[in-house]
Amino acid sequence: MTKLLYITAHPLDELGSNSMAAGKTFVDSYKENHPSDEVKHIDLFNEDIPMIDKDVLTGWGKLRNGDELTSEEQQKVNRLSEILDEFLEADKYVFVSPMWNLSFPPVLKAYIDAISIAGKTFKYTAEGPQGLLTDKKVLHIQSRGGYYTEGPAAEVESGDRYLRNIMTFLGVPSYETIIIEGHNAEPEKTEEIKAASIAEAKELAKTF
């Protein structure tokens, strides 16, 4: 059975967020067009996503040396392993995020750190790092109040660019986007911009 992870990094729901509205439309259409697939929603703002901190680094070091971990170290290391295992079990990933300060919310970076693990999602070879997620698909749905796809602002856009780069690093061969932008720059076009993203999400879900 094909499994899709719907990974949202937004504190608002579809009523308050253009990206979440497009994401919900995508998931509804995907379920309709792929009834035998499993879809799981991971709401990063309501999940325990440990930061890679001193406890984690120390815990990983103790595991390599066969030493005993503290309860705090063990709890965080175990949780990170659960996150990674769940990610690896899936076949497709849909990330939903807003643009915050030219990037995306920090909870998404914490999640990416949790799944970017040497020996699991990539490996080191004599020729350099090699991604291991060679049979996966990714979609990123991101909303931006201004215009960052083209023009001078494109150079400072760091959210979708980073996600695309890290997924390529991990070996993902298929990366697609639904970019919703300009609704703050041109508020009179807000409904038009939102409607276009909803239509795009519904259509893309049919073949994703």
UniProtKB/Swiss-Prot annotation:
Record's keyword terms, sorted: Flavoprotein, FMN, NAD, Oxidoreductase
Sections of the chain in a coiled coil: none
Reported cofactor(s): FMN
Source organism superkingdom: Bacteria
Pfam families: Flavodoxin_2
Catalysed reactions listed for this entry: 2 a quinone + NADH + H(+) = 2 a 1,4-benzosemiquinone + NAD(+); N,N-dimethyl-1,4-phenylenediamine + anthranilate + 2 NAD(+) = 2-(4-dimethylaminophenyl)diazenylbenzoate + 2 NADH + 2 H(+)
Positions with a binding annotation for FMN: S17, N18, S19, M99, W100, N101, L102, S143, R144, G145, G146
Enzyme Commission designation: 1.6.5.-, 1.7.1.17
Transmembrane portions of the chain: none
Cofactor mode of binding and number, as noted: Binds 1 FMN per subunit.
UniProt GO MF annotations: electron transfer activity; FMN binding; oxidoreductase activity, acting on NAD(P)H as acceptor; oxidoreductase activity, acting on NAD(P)H, quinone or similar compound as acceptor
Entry's family note: Belongs to the azoreductase type 1 family.
Assembly description: Homodimer.
Described purpose of this protein according to its UniProt entry: Quinone reductase that provides resistance to thiol-specific stress caused by electrophilic quinones. Also exhibits azoreductase activity. Catalyzes the reductive cleavage of the azo bond in aromatic azo compounds to the corresponding amines.
PANTHER family xref list: FMN-DEPENDENT NADH-AZOREDUCTASE 1, FMN-DEPENDENT NADH:QUINONE OXIDOREDUCTASE
Name of protein: FMN-dependent NADH:quinone oxidoreductase
Organism field: Staphylococcus haemolyticus (strain JCSC1435)
Gene name for this UniProt entry: azoR
